[in-house]
Amino acid sequence: MQICLNPIIAFGPNDPPLKYLLNLKDIVQNSECKATKEILDYFSVEESTWNPQKVAATEDLNIHILRSLESHNTVAIQGPPGTGKTYRMGRLVAQLLSERKSVLVTALTNEALKVVASKEDLKPYLESGKVSKTSLTIDERHELPKLVANEGNVCNATPGHLSLATFYISSGWAKDMLETTPFDYVIVDEASQALLPMIAASKKLGSKVVWIGDQKQLAPIVKTNEDKINTCGWSPIVKGFDTLCNNIPMPTFMLSDTF
């Protein structure tokens, strides 16, 4: 994977910490990591590999995902707004926790993580102190008093527990991770908001990885001229989820029904 020497700066709803970008830089430069190389060193294909199985609202998505993960380590799911992506993610996490799996859900924003924590299927685990979140704010403590603060924002993979962390925090965990893979499952929410190195970073953190997002959603906002992005070949990096779905073979699903 070739990257121009000029820095590329990406912005979400708020400017991300510089350390987030440095984390991703370190992940890209670590050429010895097999897990990330599977994503970063992808072969661009002329014809898209995206050929998802459509899943109706009446179907149990968990069955499809878990069956696929018996023979693969990764799954990609897409769904337009209103197709219940977060609801279905909550159901998946609840089933995994019931099987005493360690689960990380990571997303660009703290707001997205809060929405996950508030899902009805996760209420028993929230009430029993089995859901923790990094950088827990006073407002979040007020809204979800049973949500456990991850003091020190440490990588806290624990069987039967859900960890919630932003891309910024989880990218740091991935950067520092050597050979061990801490979580049984990593679920990347808002995957369309992830740069390609963040997509790759998630593979360092979980034995099984589920990416879920909307391929048609806007990619991360980048404060760099679009012509320069195209000239330097940065578009696949910026549109990480799109690059993943169109170039890397894996089980894929499309949520087609709105609730």
Question: Which positions does each model-derived feature cover?
Answer:
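Charge-rich, solvent-exposed alpha-helical interaction surfaces
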Residues: 20-23, 27, 38-42, 64
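Conserved ASCE P-loop ATPase motor domains encompassing nucleic-acid-directed helicases/translocases
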Residues: 1-30
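Short, flexible coil/linker elements and helix-boundary hinge sites characteristic
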Residues: 23, 30-32, 44, 100, ...
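ASCE P-loop NTPase helicase motor core
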Residues: 46-149, 157, 162, 166-259
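A beta-rich soluble binding module of mature secreted/lumenal proteins
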Residues: 21, 36, 245-248
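Charged, amphipathic alpha-helical linker segments immediately N-terminal to NTP-binding catalytic cores
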Residues: 29-53
